[in-house]
């Protein structure tokens, strides 16, 4: 019997494939994105030391929710926190999500606020 896998299972497989290639260092940490039904979470991770350097989510930002405006607010917030810690270059880890909509808005807001990836 052929069954269709859920989109979240397929996303996790894509994420594992990406994680074999993408890793963050102390000079260029990894910007990780997680998207839930209600909120958007972003964290900057140093994979060599396995520590989270800074994080932001749509609960902290002015715009609650998981829409494109919230993604832009979270992107600006994480860029502000990263620049305060002296982080300018990051590796973008989209966690298997398509580079479209909220993920693209978040990345564009980070770039506009001064992060480079």
Curated annotation (Swiss-Prot):
Task: List this protein's GO terms for biological process.
Answer: translation
Checking InterPro entries in the record gives: Ribosomal_uL18_bac-type (IPR004389), Ribosomal_uL18_bac/euk (IPR005484)
On whether Oxidoreductase is a keyword of this UniProt record, the answer is no
Gene3D superfamilies, alphabetized: 3.30.420.100
- Which keywords are on file for this protein? Ribonucleoprotein, Ribosomal protein, RNA-binding, rRNA-binding
Q: Name one GO molecular function term.
A: structural constituent of ribosome
**GO CC, one annotated term:** cytosolic large ribosomal subunit
Which superkingdom, per the lineage?
A: Bacteria
Q: Family, per the entry?
A: Belongs to the universal ribosomal protein uL18 family.
On subunit structure and binding partners, the annotation says: Part of the 50S ribosomal subunit; part of the 5S rRNA/L5/L18/L25 subcomplex. Contacts the 5S and 23S rRNAs.
What is the purpose of this protein? This is one of the proteins that bind and probably mediate the attachment of the 5S RNA into the large ribosomal subunit, where it forms part of the central protuberance.
The UniProt entry, under HAMAP family, shows: Ribosomal_uL18_B (MF_01337_B)
NCBIfam families, sorted: L18_bact (TIGR00060)
Task: Indicate what this protein is called per its UniProt record.
Answer: Large ribosomal subunit protein uL18
| Organism for this UniProt entry | Onion yellows phytoplasma (strain OY-M)
The gene designation is rplR
């Amino acid at each position: 019997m052929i069954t269709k896998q859920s989109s979240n299972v397929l996303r996790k497989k894509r994420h594992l494939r990406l994680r074999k290639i993408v890793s963050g260092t102390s000079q260029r940490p990894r910007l990780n994105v997680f998207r839930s039904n209600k909120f958007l979470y972003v964290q900057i991770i140093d994979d060599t030391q396995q520590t989270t350097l800074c994080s932001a989510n749509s609960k902290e930002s002015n715009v609650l929710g998981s829409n494109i405006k919230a993604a832009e607010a979270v992107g600006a917030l994480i860029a502000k926190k990263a620049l305060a810690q002296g982080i300018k270059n990051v590796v973008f880890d989209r966690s298997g999500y398509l580079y479209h909509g909220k993920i693209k808005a978040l990345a564009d807001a980070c770039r506009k606020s001064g992060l480079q990836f």
